[in-house]
Amino acid sequence: GDVGLAGKYAKKLCAKKGLAYHGLMGIRMPENYIAMYQAPCKEEAREIIRRAKEPIQHACSLIGGKKEFPEQESTLANVLKSGMVNDLFYPLFVTAKGYHTTSACIGCGKCAALCPLNNIRMEGKQPVWGNECTQCMACICGCPAKAVEYRKKTHGKERYYLEG
């Protein structure tokens, strides 16, 4: 993918949070949105990450030097894609409804721990999803038992989660 209009949204978010916006940089990483796409196999994911190291180091040097990131060109394609995704797709389709565990769930709670929105709570040894999901796929792709699924869209699919 590309950054689309992420700069526009990041700039608004920074202003809302009282932070200075210094730009953004798109860095290709392995796909993990397995509700719609296919994640790469482990070997391909490693290669994608290997290729990402140089742009990450460049971003770090810009940050370390307190320099702005280069301005990202906003194309009509970016406007259409990002506009459609953020204005139509997100409100209509991005929901926690449909997340569930299979009998393979070991009740470890890792899904709840990985959720950046704290949208998953454990009731006994079972995860329960709230309503604040952004579909980051961390709960699905980070599950050690591969027991978290989203509707029927993720069954049997390769999972990718970058461990820290």
Residue ranges and their predicted role:
Residues 5-6, 97, 107, 135:
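Residue-level preference for nonpolar/small residues embedded in alpha-helices
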Residues 75-107, 113:
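A mid-sequence, solvent-exposed acidic-amphipathic segment
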Residues 101, 110-128, 134, 138-155:
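Iron-sulfur cluster-binding cysteine motifs and their immediate structural context
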